[in-house]
Amino acid sequence: MSKIRVYELAKELRVPSKVLINVLMDEFGVEVKNHMSVIEDEDAALIKELLAGSEANSELVAEYEAELAEEVNNAAKKKKKRKKGSEDDSLEQDVEVIEIGKTITVKELAEKLNKPVNDVIKTLIFTGVMAAINQEIDFETAEKVAEKYEVAVYEKEEENTLEEFEEETDVEEENLAKRPPIITVMGHVDHGKTSLLDAIRKSKVTSTEAGGITQHIGAYTVEVNGETLTFLDTPGHEAFTAMRARGAQITDVVILVVAADDGIMPQTVEAINHCKAANVPMIVAINKMDREGANPDRVKQELTEHGLVVEDWGGDIIAVPVSAKTRENIDTLLEMVLLTSEMQELKADAGRKAKGTVVEAKLDKGRGAVATLLVQNGTLHMGDSIIVGSTYGRIRAMFDDSGKKIKSAGPSIPVEVLGLSEVPAAGDRFTVVKDEKTARNMAEARKEKIRQESFATSHRVSLEDLYSQIKEGSVKELSVIVKADVQGSVEAIKASLEKLSTDDVKVRVIHGAVGAISETDITLAAASNAIVIGFNVRPDNNAVAASERDGVEVKTYRVIYDAIEDIKSAMIGMLDPEYKEVVLGTAEIRATYKISNVGTIAGGYVLTGKLVRNADVRVIREGIVIFESKLASLKRFKDDVKEVNAGYECGFSVEKFNDIKEGDIIEAYTMEAVQRKEL
């Protein structure tokens, strides 16, 4: 009877080995010593049946959360023991076992194997790998080296397993309650974004604040008709997209500010495309209505050119004419924001451990690392231990947007916190964990993971690897950013590219504009996994550096046809090839023999072409195809052969078919792939 190791079963069930060991011993009475212990397939099948499904796994992790936390906390101690050379008594196996991460240096591997570094380097050379003493090698290469020394290797589990399972925990519907919406303001420079934010803040500031002055922490809340709105005071789509590129989708509604006297400008178009790419609802604030040249109808007309039709004209985009200077229609704008957010039914569970995102962070001379956190779920309390990206800390003090010290903050509430070990990056996710020790060990594990991932190749989409990514199912559409020297070229390339879309793969131009390829374009491409195409323009120095850093492909052309053909070639490569049938040969059945435990063997004469072993065949009787299968065997006299040519006799059997009769014709054929030349 076959067996399975505990760690292999744990991988299948997506639970930590430690938890599975406890369950096996406590719940099922199966004696296991460690993750390398083996259990019978029957026991494994029963456990799979009982623990299958995410709900069961979540309950399992919740039940053994203490053990998980203990495992994470003891990770650092285990590392120290390994450095001292102490052996792990728990591995009572005949074969020696070592634990390594996704990558390891040659020196570290030699220490774990307890072998001289020179011997390990020689072994690597014999396996075809040239590596120096401090060079990193991947897990598969290390495994091959360990096999030479008869040592088993397994990949160690991430030490932040507890946090990952906490994040996967299902949310109870009855615990969800309404939360305030989070709003970001975007638009062209000098169109009044900051003035509008100031007008909103001054008109809705609470009387309890000293002098009505709000401390700048990167976000603030206002009260509208008894409802709370949270504004991110980080105007500009660059910050918005940079955070989205880090996986932080925190905005619920975007206010797009357009000057009534200026209309749609290049940065306005960028902001529109960024919002569309993020799939966030927009409300247009037509600002500067107090100016003499204000023309809101012109703004509405220009919006339609970018796919935004306002409600007045039969569309679904809300547009509100406002004036930040006179505060005209500010209340109406806020009511529209409230209405849009209500349509989304925004909810969160305030009773959970807090999770959220860093809005901004800085190093203060007197207070150390200071970060503005936006709580997205749960409630953050003073004294909580948190992990933020690859840093950690314990919250020593918390302040709201008015600078007042508070003890807790619920969903959608921004707070400034002190107590972090380092300054995190904007867009980093934070999670409350059991204690500071757990947070520290998780942060160390994350730093190690980041270091290892820096050695891995980028998996950004590119024209060259588009076909393989489609096959893997990782790309369903090709997103493109187009920059050109004139608007006519942008429109021509955009129209031509979008015509290339097929049922399998859609080409989507997420942004098109006039001018050099900028760092902002690269940021959007990184966030949307897009390719940047330039026509008669070049990337600036910052864009080149950003594209190399983020692994974004930038293609430049001088002929529109070349750009279209490159994309078309990549698209053709994505499509499944066409197949045509090629007949290999035919044979006539002249005798049949029935053999027990084998079936019917046919003796035949090859009429045309050749018969090839394992070829697809048709059995034809009186001109009618009666069966299709494969040649199971092919012999000439007593010898197995690969093929028999025309004019020779042979013996063969047809897979899963015994009703062969004299006079039947066997037609052998193959299906050849033909490269597609057009979409």
Curated annotation (Swiss-Prot):
Indicate the family of this protein: Belongs to the TRAFAC class translation factor GTPase superfamily. Classic translation factor GTPase family. IF-2 subfamily.
Q: Which GO terms describe its molecular function?
A: GTP binding; GTPase activity; translation initiation factor activity
Entries under HAMAP family matching the protein: IF_2_B
Q: What is this protein called?
A: Translation initiation factor IF-2
Q: Where is this region: G1?
A: 187-194
| Classification via Pfam families | EF-G_D2, GTP_EFTU, GTP_EFTU_D2, IF-2, IF2_N
Q: What's an example GO cellular component term for this entry? A: cytosol
Name its species: Clostridium perfringens (strain SM101 / Type A)
Residues binding GTP are 187-194, 233-237, 287-290
| Top-level division of the source organism's lineage | Bacteria
* Main function: One of the essential components for the initiation of protein synthesis. Protects formylmethionyl-tRNA from spontaneous hydrolysis and promotes its binding to the 30S ribosomal subunits. Also involved in the hydrolysis of GTP during the formation of the 70S ribosomal complex.
Q: Which residues form the tr-type G domain?
A: 178-347
Spell out the residue ranges making up region: G5.
323-325
